[in-house]
Amino acid sequence: MALILSACSQENSPNETAVVTENAPQTTQPSEAIRIAAAANLSDVLPEIIEGYKKDKNLPNQEIEVTFASSGKLYSQITAGAPYDIFLAANQEFPAKLVDGMFKGDSSRTPFTYTQGQLSIYSAAKPVDSLNQSTLTELLKRDDKTKITIANPELAPYGESAKAYLQAQNLYDSLTAKKRIIQAENIGQAFQYAHTGNVDYGFVAQSQVTAIKATPEQFYILPADSYPAILQDGIVITDVASAADFTDYLRSPAGQAYFAKAGYLAVK
């Protein structure tokens, strides 16, 4: 069988898929396919975790289908009946809304925290490693030509935290009024805008910076206490046994090691 990845963001065609075939011999009978709806910021680390899961569990032929998109878009798909087994959001809000909505009264559907994200400033062309909160604020205030990008704060938790950070620095309203904020659909597209030079700076996930092996001068990790904590929750949607087994692996020391290596903060 295969690991199937798809994306719902604008930077990837909705119909585009990547298939990686496993040639290792089957040592354990795989369960039925696991279908995962995953926040766009997981597009780099989740495939590695899946391969680790299949190796550690002796399930080389386990089929796992992943759709990456903004958490808000995935939430809408799930409430509309999309056939997912697991929802891995980029915040705690959307899994909680499922509990209060379509899973109301079902005590077996309990969200769990699987990682904590870090917010960074990234630029493909301008050095940012010498920045701190004060100098970043001054930079964004004084340079009227500078454009930044954030993910849609209504749909993407990283965008919501970026907006909160800018509001705390009394920057958001003025930058919006001057049309200096280029809003991306999700964190994946925000990173593409910054990485390709379409904007000067991007508020991105540190995991994205780690994935491309960015040089130290290309990013600045914002202090964790300067924006709302990006605690990422998941929830098992169906009764597929392998879905619960996979989410247990996410929270295990082995799963958390993948997250830490990828630029996230491990959770217990």
Predicted segments, located by residue:
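Exported/periplasmic ABC-transporter solute-binding proteins
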Residues: 8-54, 59, 72, 79, ...
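Central helical "cap/lid" subdomain
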Residues: 102-112
